[in-house]
């Protein structure tokens, strides 16, 4: 059970704090409600670019990392399709260093032409190395583009093309900063061994003076329901052919999420899982196999993927996946299978609650979802999933017309 207190400052910043008496560290987390989904289709990759730019210093603090290091702390960040997260861990007595740094870059980021060009080069090189020049690098990008035709989930966090980053102007990025990086679009979450009211007062001290910006959010286009199967085959210079089947499913706050997460673990969570046992060990069709959910806020994807062994045709692998899907749709999962997966999730959740950084991140995440109480309710939500729910989800989701199939063939 994670206890917390919440306050919304006059400028719109949401603050959530948790007292952890067992830790000598403080975790300070800032979540900005901006990800790839908030980008202009003609200017993608900006949220990820800003993950880099936010470490380039402000007018008051030219070197962001130096004060963190002097305070014996550590910091990092990540960006996904739905949000951007910045976090700092440091000794609890130095907590105000983290609050000072985060409040300063929320308002005073110093974006110069030189800094912008330097980070553009870094991001473009990352794009090339991870997605264009690396084996299988463009596979997830191709699958997204196949499954989504309207929603901005059709591009990855890195963007649609490096040309969008190369063409970004100073005016473009300053406008993006003004639109998305301000108090009412952010959540500050803290876990440390301090009285909650004191932590809330410290948040007031450092963040209340910041002015908010009035911004009209752009609507996110809704992805139309897929009615017909989609297929794409590409050939690349890779060691082995891979096959991916992606099915649309509900978003993060839908009941679909819990059922789908259990199903994905039931299918591929370890050596005793169905897909590994049947397709890797017994039938020897695949070298590796996975089933996972994207976990996006808006309706996301349930993906089956496998790397084919030499001698396995894509048609064989696809037929094997279909057979596993049909079993899910027709034969109730055993109580033992389902209970094993539920126990694993509960254990992981309880273990994660021991870490101050996990708690700070999760407080921000659930507040962003709009249901902060869910931080203490997800175990019960997973526990409530029945074998009947798994059957119903599988029948509703794993339909041929709801499937996008990508065959990523190795050149002969």
Regions found by a protein language model. Name each.
Residues 1-6, 144-186, 218-223, 349, ...:
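Histidine-acidic residue clusters that define the catalytic metal-binding segment
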Residues 5, 149-150, 154, 182-251, ...:
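An aromatic/glycine/proline-enriched structural segment found at the starts
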Residues 12, 30, 48, 86, ...:
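Buried hydrophobic packing residues in well-ordered domains
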Residues 27-89, 155-158, 270-285:
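M16/MPP (pitrilysin/insulinase) zinc-metallopeptidase core fold and M16-derived inactive scaffolds
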Residues 187-190, 307, 327-328, 332, ...:
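C-terminal regions of mature proteins
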């Amino acid at each position: 059970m994670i206890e917390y207190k919440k306050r919304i400052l006059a400028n719109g910043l949401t603050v959530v704090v948790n007292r952890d008496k067992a830790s000598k560290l403080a975790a300070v987390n800032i979540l900005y409600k901006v990800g790839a989904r908030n980008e202009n289709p003609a200017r993608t990759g900006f949220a990820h670019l800003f993950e880099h730019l936010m470490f380039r210093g402000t007018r008051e603090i030219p070197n962001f990392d130096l004060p963190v290091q002097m305070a014996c702390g550590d910091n990092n960040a990540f960006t996904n399709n739905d949000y951007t997260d910045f976090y700092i861990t440091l000794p609890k007595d130095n907590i105000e260093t983290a609050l000072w740094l985060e409040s300063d870059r929320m308002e005073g980021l110093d974006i110069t032409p030189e800094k912008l060009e330097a980070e553009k080069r870094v991001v473009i090189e990352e794009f090339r190395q991870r997605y264009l020049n690396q084996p299988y690098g463009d596979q997830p990008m191709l699958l997204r583009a196949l499954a989504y035709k309207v929603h901005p989930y059709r591009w990855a966090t890195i963007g649609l093309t490096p040309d969008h980053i190369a063409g970004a102007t100073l005016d473009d990025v300053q406008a993006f900063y003004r639109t998305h990086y301000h108090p009412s679009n952010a959540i500050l979450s803290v876990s440390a061994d301090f009285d909650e009211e004191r932590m809330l007062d410290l948040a007031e001290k450092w963040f209340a003076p910041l002015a908010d910006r009035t911004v009209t959010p752009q609507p996110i286009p809704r992805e139309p329901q897929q009615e017909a199967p989609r297929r794409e085959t590409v050939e690349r210079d890779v060691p082995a052919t891979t096959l991916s089947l992606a099915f649309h499913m509900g978003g993060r706050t839908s009941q679909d999420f819990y059922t789908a997460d259990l199903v994905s673990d039931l299918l591929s969570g370890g050596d005793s899982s169905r897909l590994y046992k049947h397709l890797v060990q017994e039938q020897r069709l695949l070298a590796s196999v996975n089933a996972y959910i994207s976990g996006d806020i808006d309706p996301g994807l349930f993906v089956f993927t496998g790397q084919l062994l030499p001698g396995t045709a894509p048609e064989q692998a696809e037929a094997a996946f279909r057979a596993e899907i049909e079993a899910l749709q027709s034969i109730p999962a055993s109580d033992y299978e389902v209970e094993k997966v539920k126990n694993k999730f509960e254990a992981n959740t309880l273990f994660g609650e021991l870490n101050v950084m996990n708690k700070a991140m999760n407080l921000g995440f659930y507040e962003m979802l709009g249901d902060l109480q869910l931080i203490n309710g997800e175990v019960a939500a997973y526990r409530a999933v029945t074998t009947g729910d798994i059957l119903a989800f599988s029948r509703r989701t794993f339909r041929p017309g709801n499937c996008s199939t990508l065959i990523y063939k190795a050149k002969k």
